[in-house]
Amino acid sequence: MTLTQFGGLFVVYLISLVFILTLTYQEFRRVRFNFNIFFSLLYLLTFYFGFPLTCLLVFQFDVEVVPVDALLHALLASTCFYGIYYVSYKTRLRKPSMQPKAPVFTMNRVETNFTWLLLASVAVVTVGLFFMQNGFLLFKLQSYSQIFSSQVSGVALKRFFYFFIPAMLVVYFLKPTQLRWLFFLISTVAFGILTYVVVGGTRANIIIAFALFLFIGIVRGWITLWMLVTAGAIGIVGMFWLALKRYSLDVSGAEAFYTFLYLTRDTFSPWENFALLLNNYDKIDFQGLAPIIRDFYVFIPSWLWPGRPDAVLNSANYFTWEVLDNHSGLAISPTLIGSLVVMGGVLFIPVGAIVVGLIIKWFDWIYELGKQETNRYKAAILQAFCFGAIFNMIVLAREGVDSFVSRVVFFCIIFGLCLVIAKLLYWLFESAGLIRMYLTGNRVVSQKCPLQCEERKWS
């Protein structure tokens, strides 16, 4: 990359960055937080944060990068995608109705407590089962890629670890005080560190817990935007340190700075992967919607499907194995836009932008229902569901549409099952006479009025 080429790229990058930041800041001033703001920040992190890191690697360490044409196309495609997404998100699909609608479901105190206990139990039990089968993998494996090898059993259990976070979100939203906010951080980060040691280097739970803590603080006004930026910088350094431990790297001096640049870029902003995919566009045999279907394979146990393929050809694996002919054992993320290109070429980019806009709009709709809900138990469930799905949005931006669809469906099923089981448990305990109502003014308050009713758990 010459200085002239860098100058041209920088102009495009700066225009794109100002465009997205302006729209995001306007939204922030209007509502302070919604999932459009979160997705926009996540999008900036994924597709734009890595550009200065790439430039430092090129000019400071003479690193070979993707051809400039591909980098330019990646920046232009990313900006066009966001523009279409924003229009799709802002388009009103129906007129707002002032007529109250019948609630789909209601919640009471006991049902809500059962729900978060079930969610937490799912996470704790599966971590225990994984540990019993494998021990502390962080101290047993020689390299991170061994996590995906046949010597590690019960890999599917890792999908359940995340449910500890929505469980703690329910606890917080039941009584959103600063004390519970801090408890959320301590409990989820501690659990994330446990999973990091048990699994052997998976940092997702720690990152998500810290990010949720920050965004809840922004929503409540407990931290400022500058505090968020400072905490983000601390988080980046923390993730770099964990990456060094994960890959067993011992670096210092200029080598440490070089390692910091490329690990931070690959962790937070794999935008060069998208450029690399565009550079190999002629090698892509468009997969259609098959990667979405294939990504569900990992949720099907082998005893139920004896002939299940060991290697799932989703968009990330297709990009790694078929396009790049890379069989190192680690999948290279194609990013959100890259997964669309794998499925249907550049024509899928505007279609995907429209669909993503509608998805984020749906999450914001549920979030608003939770904020406006007068039943605080139902409000806690709705808001915990939305904030709990933030991990899936990170997967959407970083990994792609296929990974997002399978994970969000899985998340909804497990969350919904815990909700249904909690209601069944409440019905069983109530039928057995183990739950009774409080008395208010010489009369029993009806269970159907959850705002005025408090259930005592054990009689």
Curated annotation (Swiss-Prot):
Coiled-coil stretches noted in the UniProt entry, renumbered to this chain: none
Location within or outside the cell: Cell inner membrane
Its job: Probably involved in the polymerization of enterobacterial common antigen (ECA) trisaccharide repeat units.
Family: Belongs to the WzyE family.
Superkingdom per UniProt: Bacteria
Subunit: Probably part of a complex composed of WzxE, WzyE and WzzE.
Protein name: Probable ECA polymerase
Ranges annotated as spanning the membrane: 3-23, 37-57, 65-85, 119-139, 154-174, 181-201, 206-226, 227-247, 340-360, 377-397, 409-429
Keywords: Cell inner membrane, Cell membrane, Membrane, Transmembrane, Transmembrane helix
Family matches, as InterPro entries: WzyE (IPR010691)
One Gene Ontology cellular component: plasma membrane
Keyword Transmembrane helix in record: yes
Any single GO BP term: enterobacterial common antigen biosynthetic process
Keyword Transmembrane in record: yes
Annotated pathway: Bacterial outer membrane biogenesis; enterobacterial common antigen biosynthesis
Membrane topology: Multi-pass membrane protein
